[in-house]
C-alpha cells in the first residue's frame, strides 16, 4: 500500500508531491500549497478562472459545474453538469467528474473517473481508477477519532479525515461505501453494494468481507 506500489506517478501532475511520500495519504495536507505553487507556472494552454483556479483550455467544464479554488483541471478532463469541486482538487488529464459528484482535497490521476453521484473527499484515485454510480469515499469516523488503516500490521495515519486510496485501474462497483482509510490495490475490483474497510490487495476481487479472491 506504499505510494510506489499503488501508482505510476508519471500519470499525474502531482508526481513531485507524491514521490516524497512513503504512504499516499501523507500528501493530502499539502495539496493546496502544491496547487498554489504549480498553478502560476502553468503555460498559456491553461486559463485562470477566478481565484486560484487553473483550467486547461481543452478541458470541458459544464457551465453548471462549480469550481472552488485552489484547483487544477488538466488537459482533456471533463467536469460535467452539476459537478461540485469544493476546493483543493487536482483533476488529471482525461479524468471525469460527473453529475452531482463532489470533490474535496483530492488527487485524481489521469483518466480517473468519478462520473455519477460520487463523493470523493480526502482521497486519491489512481490512473484509470473508476467509481461506479453512487459509490462514495467516507472520510470521517462517526466518533471523530483518528483513522487507522486496517492492514497487517495496522497503520496509524494521524489523520482525522481520510477517505480512500485507489490504486491504478481499481474498479469500484455501484453504490459502494469505502469506509475511512480504505486502500484498494492496483487493478483490484469491488462488487457493487459493498461496504469496504481495510485493504484489498492488488488484482483481487472483493466480494464480501470474508471473500476476497485473486483475479483469474
Identify the residue ranges that each predicted region occupies:
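Glycine-rich hexapeptide-repeat left-handed beta-helix
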Residues: 15-16, 108, 115-216
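Residue "hotspots" at secondary-structure boundaries inside conserved domains
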Residues: 51-53, 71, 182, 198
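Short, functional N-terminal and low-complexity linear motifs
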Residues: 1-3, 43-46, 61-62, 93-99, ...
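Short, flexible, glycine/charge-rich loop motifs used to bind or transfer phosphoryl groups or to couple energy/partner
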Residues: 17, 49-50, 68, 96, ...
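Short secondary-structure boundary/capping elements
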Residues: 87, 95-98, 158, 162
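Terminal amphipathic alpha-helical/low-complexity segments used for targeting or macromolecular assembly
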Residues: 1-52, 57, 187, 193, ...
